[in-house]
Structures are given as structure tokens and as C-alpha cells.
Amino acid sequence: MSDTIAAIATAHGVGSISIVRLSGERALEFALRFSRKTKLTPRHATFTKLFNQNNEIIDEAIMIYFKAPYSFTGEDIVEFQTHGGFSVSEVLLEELVSLGARFALAGEFSKRACLNGKMTPLKALNIQDLILSKSALAAKIIARNMQGNLGELLEKIRTDLVKTLAFVETSIDYADDDLPSDLLEKISTMCEENSKILKEIYTLSQSKKGLIEGFKIAIIGKPNVGKSSLLNALLSYERAIVSDIAGTTRDTIEESFKLGTHLLRIIDTAGIRESKDTIEQIGVALSKKSLEDADIILAVFDASRVQDKEDEKIFELLANTDKKIFWILNKSDLENVFKNTRNKNFIKLSAQKDIALLKEELQNYLNSFDSEGIMVSSLDLINACKISSEAIFRAKELLEESSLELFAFELNLAINELARFTKDFQRDEILDEMFGNFCLGK
């Protein structure tokens, strides 16, 4: 990491300020050359003119110097706050590269921060998730993780496993010495507790992923019951074509909108019915796939039409789902001839006039989700927690069977999975645990 890297840190486009970030051993040298300054005081904002190599002014800017190791990357960093827009920051970046800097790769500043011990991979992941968060609630959950709660917990579990592995591998090396029964019991309890904690993290993260990613809602029903009108009403603008002709929507339409603090990703599906039309059949198949992916289902029926076989097909399709279903009787402002033979708790509304009741019911349901507890959004981390939990549980069973070599194998697997997000697992740690408490000179 001896080279110096540079990148524009702000979003591309027109704005009042653009930030160019420079990191590496030559960062201060380049900054002094551009500003014609002789020195920069660390952590002080310096107003200056910036010049190119032909001594032509590029811009008036503010420079901030972060001296290593007290910086984001742990290296010397200089940030240039220039005027925004498309040109100034690009010119500055090109000039930096012409002096000897290198265009930074995606995520390279964070990577250097991890390699220099300024943050764990988990924190870097949380920062990325925070940047990409789509709602205030998601940002709150991710920010809570950034405070170290999750990282500290995973590191504690990893440390417990490393210490346990040290005891067990010592026992394997000295096969004549069995592990004391009380120690075996403690190890078994530790495995059970840590496996349970990791399982709670990944199951909670999967069951409440909508709090972070946005809840996915599928609108389902036979053709021409007002699904597209309902979509438009929820979005508060016309996104889907509304027509009296059945089968107008032949593909799924997905849009996002906010309801209170929650992000909702809503899908208008093709009407489900028997059809010989190939295109419509594909649309129906996509509708059924949307049901599988959805967190919430809006099942729509037409109050102005007598219940028929196509309505029955919708009831049958949803009979065995464990998803939350809101039963909606649309067009309730017209003469109501629909018979509620299934005794469903219908929300009666008119998508073209007023859906306030549906929004209220949706918000009450979403607000019932507890945002407390440790949740993660990274699929990679969720899988790591799952793999580790299962490996630790298998290790516990193998310990009870006195299969210490296989126990050590499973524990190694769990340690390595967790280490990807906390710190690198080095085999020397096992040796440190083995001999760290020995007498001096031994």
C-alpha cells in the first residue's frame, strides 16, 4: 500500500460542494504542491487556491489534512473541498494522477482502513449499508450496529471459540490426558449458548429484513378487480394503465413508496385466470412467483361482481400461505353483490376514491414489528452466522461423542466464518492461548 490513491468522494452531478480525497504516503506532498503552501496543520481547515502544473488556478477550495495514523485509512489523508459540478473535481483528480497518484478502486479507502486496523470488515459493511439505507428506520438499525454491539458480540463469540479450541487441541496432542468432566460441561454449555445467539441473529434478520430492505407487497386478484387502480392510489400517481379491459396488466410492475417510517416495495401483478394467451400465461406465472417473494399480500376482490370460479382460485391459491394477507373488497362505492362465503375480514374501499383505511391498517401492522434486537442486512453475514451456528451445534454433539478431532474441525469452521467480519484468524492465536499463561522462561 505504498502508492497514493485519489477519488471523488461525493456523488457525481451538480452540487454546491465536491470532495476529492487523497490517501497515501505522498498525500501531503501533493497537497502542498497544488496549494503552494509550505505546511498544513493536521485537522485544520485551510482556505487556499489550487493550481495546476502550469501554475493556472483550478479553484478556490478548503483543504483538510489528516496525519497518519489519525485518519480514516490510517495513512496520511488530504481532503479537497472544491466547488461542485462536473468539471472542477474531475480536473483536480486528473492533476493528482498526473503527479503520481493512482485512481482508487471501488471501496479501496475502506479496504485500507481495515488493513491498517482502523475498522473491522463488519464496520465497513455497516457503513456501506448505512449509505445505501432506504428509510429512516433502516438507518437507525444500521447505525445501532455501527456502535459496536454486533461487532463486540461476534468478537466475543470468536474469542470463546479460539480459547476452547486451544484447550481441545492441547488435549488431542496429549491423548493420554482426558479433558476434565467439569471442563467438558463448560465447553458444551458455551457451544450451546453461542450457537443459540448466532441462530437468533440470522433468524431475526431474515424474519425482519423488511425493516431494513423494505417490505415487499404483492397485489393479487383476478383480472379487472382494480389492482392497478390500487397501486396508483398507494403511490399517489398513475404508474399503471387502468382499463375496463380484463388482462390489461400482463407483466409485474414494481415501485417503492414510503408509509410513515417504512419503505414499501409494491408489486402489481397480472390478473390470475385461465387463459390460452401465451403472454398472459407468462404474466400469471410471474404473479405466482411474486407471491412467493412477498412479505405482505393484498388480495383484491370486486364488490360489484358476483363471486365466481376465478375468485375461488385466488382463495385456494392463498389457503396455505403463511404470509400476512389483507383481504380487500374494492369498488365498495358501487352496489355490493359479492358474497363473503369465506368469512374473511375484508377492508371495504374504493381505490379510485379513498384508501385511507388500508393505509392505516398497513401502518398499524408495520409498526407492530419490533426494531430492537440485533439485525443485519448483509446476506453474506447472515449466511456466516448461520454456518457458524450450525458448525458450533455440530461441534457440541461431537464433543459429547468424544470425537475431539472432528470437534476441532467444526470449531475451526465457525471461527473462520466469524473472523471474516471481525479480525483475521491466525493460527498463532491458538499458540498464544496455549502458552500465554506459562511462567517466564518456561
Swiss-Prot record:
Primary role: Exhibits a very high intrinsic GTPase hydrolysis rate. Involved in the addition of a carboxymethylaminomethyl (cmnm) group at the wobble position (U34) of certain tRNAs, forming tRNA-cmnm(5)s(2)U34.
Domain of life: Bacteria
EC number assigned by the record: 3.6.-.-
Pfam families reported in the protein's UniProt record: MMR_HSR1, MnmE_helical, TrmE_N
Protein name in the entry: tRNA modification GTPase MnmE
GO molecular function term, any single one: metal ion binding
Binding site residues for Mg(2+): S228, T249
Main location as per UniProt: cytoplasm
Enzyme class (EC, first level): hydrolase
Cofactor(s), by name: K(+)
Segments forming domain TrmE-type G: 214-367
Family classification: Belongs to the TRAFAC class TrmE-Era-EngA-EngB-Septin-like GTPase superfamily. TrmE GTPase family.
Positions annotated to bind (6S)-5-formyl-5,6,7,8-tetrahydrofolate: R21, E79, K118, K442
Binding positions for K(+) per the UniProt entry: N224, S243, I245, T248
GO cellular component term of the entry, any: cytosol
Subunit field text: Homodimer. Heterotetramer of two MnmE and two MnmG subunits.
Subcellular location: Cytoplasm
Binding site for GTP: 224-229, 243-249, 268-271
UniProt xrefs under SUPFAM superfamilies: Folate-binding domain, P-loop containing nucleoside triphosphate hydrolases
Keywords, ordered alphabetically: Cytoplasm, GTP-binding, Hydrolase, Magnesium, Metal-binding, Nucleotide-binding, Potassium, tRNA processing
A biological-process GO annotation: tRNA methylation
Cofactor binding, note field: Binds 1 potassium ion per subunit.
